[in-house]
């Protein structure tokens, strides 16, 4: 496919990027830490951590992983925490030790956590105490040999940290009881690390940096193997696209999305580290009043988010009173940005929401709207520099201009493959082209618009939910004979999970089934609706026709609207 989108690039955006400007994320980090040493890198709960402090602490943590725990280059280390100052310290410590970061959603259930730890072969995990009870239930059944435990306030000043830890544990009661007698505290790890010798390993571009877990095209969570070069390439692509709006050493980005999510990891953490910017870490973005109070304290210049976050902020009266004069980049991703939200955003802030598209397997950015656009296109924008894109039919032939086809992409940001799953890798990457599973159309200027999903994935507040996983859990309930999970529109989260169930036990209720799901699934995966049926539609070979149920369910929602 001819790169027609290049003609629509702003004049200051290049067609190609250099993914080899740095040899590794370690080199990028150390360069930024030297250049911006005394500038703030992260702020959380009012506590500022400069680049110098981050460099010192991450070096100590790397030394502890090497000398204290005896871990080697290439070992996998899991990170399970929300946005806290501990996160970047641990993240860059792991990378500087030549090890591989395995990001874990802290809201995972024991079943989900056990799978990810074992699949990745994680040798160690850094976890915040609020979720230690989850780890306790499965740690003996996993590959984990070392547990490093931290509390919410452990990277704050002594007085503030003591207060935060007391309130979190005893007032808000957010730390369920747990028993991990062999765990070492994060503070102790750093104290030991400061006295140990950090040995800088040779880290090259093709070394793995992250195992970033995703469902891919099936419900089994798989680790996308992202190399240092993959991440560096995507950083260069983001910087080339948004760079004209950004000023090195002068940015403050609002990081309300969790850093364990690939979007915030690349767009917020890594990009603004390279730019010498400051990340305002929001630990609990669901507390909208608390988030707005934080925003009122800082002249934020950039903000990333998903539609649900932007919508919630717009509906907060205090947010409407904030000063947006410093804001010059608003980027939306993870899920479609609704027109009404985009229109309200530009009316309030004076800034257009630049919507983009990506997937974990691409580190994640594939396309974005150009920075000079002065309207909400409703599209996912143009392919980023050094990226090829094509639309194909079911036989892998390119479709005619203007026709819908599966979006396939090729570029330096595309993952190596899925960790220890060559068959799954071969299904999604063919001749170097990554098949996204999303059906798109491209207009004459190269703007892409997603019109459907080839795969049955459900997108809840920017998180992928896979029907296979939901159905596997529901089928464990003794009262269920058959089940199909589909996505239906939701005003609050973009989509929500709906179940169609054939009962085995006539007494089964929707409340009982949802309660059962809550015990086995992370919150965003829990079904919001249950519809009981005498039978489910099937193909001539007995396969449940999810698409038919999904179209029917969406039709009911549309009719109600």
From Swiss-Prot:
Signal sequence interval, chain numbering: none
The protein's annotated pathway: Lipid metabolism; fatty acid beta-oxidation
Pfam family, any one: AMP-binding
GO cellular component terms attached to this protein's record: membrane
Topology of this chain in the membrane: Peripheral membrane protein
Record bears the keyword ATP-binding: yes
Transmembrane segments: none
Protein name, as recorded: Long-chain-fatty-acid--CoA ligase
Source organism of the structure: Salmonella typhimurium (strain LT2 / SGSC1412 / ATCC 700720)
Taxon lineage: Bacteria, Pseudomonadati, Pseudomonadota, Gammaproteobacteria, Enterobacterales
Gene: fadD
């Amino acid at each position: 496919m001819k790169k027609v989108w290049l003609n629509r690039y702003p004049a200051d955006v290049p067609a190609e990027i250099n993914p080899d400007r740095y040899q590794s994320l370690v080199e990028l980090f150390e360069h930024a830490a030297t250049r911006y040493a005394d500038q703030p890198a992260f702020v959380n709960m009012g506590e500022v951590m400069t680049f110098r402090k981050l460099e010192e602490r991450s070096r100590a943590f790397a030394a502890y992983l090497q000398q204290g725990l005896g871990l080697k280059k290439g070992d996998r280390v899991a990170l399970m925490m929300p946005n806290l100052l501990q996160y970047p310290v641990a993240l860059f410590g792991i990378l500087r030790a030549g090890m591989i970061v395995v990001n874990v959603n802290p809201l995972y259930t024991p079943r989900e956590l056990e799978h990810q730890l074992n699949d990745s072969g994680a040798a160690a995990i850094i976890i915040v105490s609020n979720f230690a009870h989850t780890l306790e239930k499965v740690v003996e059944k996993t590959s984990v040999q070392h547990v490093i435990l931290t509390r919410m306030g452990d990277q704050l000043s002594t007085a503030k940290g003591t207060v935060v830890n007391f309130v979190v544990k005893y007032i808000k009661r957010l730390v369920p009881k747990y028993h991990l007698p062999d765990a070492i505290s994060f503070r102790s790890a750093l104290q030991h690390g400061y006295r140990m010798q950090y040995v800088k390993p040779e880290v090259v571009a093709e070394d793995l940096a992250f195992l970033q877990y995703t469902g891919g095209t099936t419900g089994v969570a798989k680790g996308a193997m992202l190399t240092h070069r993959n991440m560096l390439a995507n950083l260069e692509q983001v910087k080339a696209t948004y760079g004209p709006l950004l000023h090195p050493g002068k940015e403050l980005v609002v990081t309300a999305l969790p850093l364990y999510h690939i979007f915030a990891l690349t767009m917020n953490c890594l990009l603004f580290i390279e730019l010498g910017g400051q990340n305002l870490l929001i630990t609990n973005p669901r507390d909208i009043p608390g988030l707005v109070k934080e925003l009122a304290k800082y002249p934020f210049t950039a903000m990333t988010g998903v539609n649900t976050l932007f919508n919630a902020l717009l509906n907060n009266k205090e947010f409407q009173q904030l000063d947006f004069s410093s804001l010059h980049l608003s980027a939306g991703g993870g899920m479609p940005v609704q027109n009404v939200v985009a229109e309200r955003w530009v009316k309030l802030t004076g800034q257009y929401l630049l919507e983009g598209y990506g997937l974990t397997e691409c580190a994640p950015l594939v396309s974005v709207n150009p920075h000079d656009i002065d309207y909400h296109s409703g599209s996912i924008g143009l392919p980023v520099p050094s990226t090829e894109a094509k639309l194909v039919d079911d036989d892998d032939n390119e479709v005619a201009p203007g026709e819908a086809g599966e979006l396939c992409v090729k570029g330096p940001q595309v993952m190596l493959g899925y960790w220890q799953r060559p068959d799954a890798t071969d299904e999604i990457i063919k001749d170097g082209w990554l098949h996204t599973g999303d059906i798109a159309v491209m207009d004459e200027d190269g703007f892409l618009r997603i019109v459907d999903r080839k795969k049955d994935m459900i997108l809840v507040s920017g998180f992928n939910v896979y029907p296979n996983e939901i159905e596997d859990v529901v089928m464990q309930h003794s009262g269920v004979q058959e089940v199909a999970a589909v996505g239906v529109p939701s005003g609050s989260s973009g989509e929500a999970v709906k179940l169609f169930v054939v009962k085995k036990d006539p007494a089964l209720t929707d409340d009982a089934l949802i309660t059962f799901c809550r015990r086995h699934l992370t919150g965003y995966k829990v079904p919001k609706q249950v519809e009981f049926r005498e039978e489910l539609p099937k193909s001539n070979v007995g396969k449940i026709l999810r698409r038919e149920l999904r179209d029917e369910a969406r039709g009911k929602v549309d009719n109600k609207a």
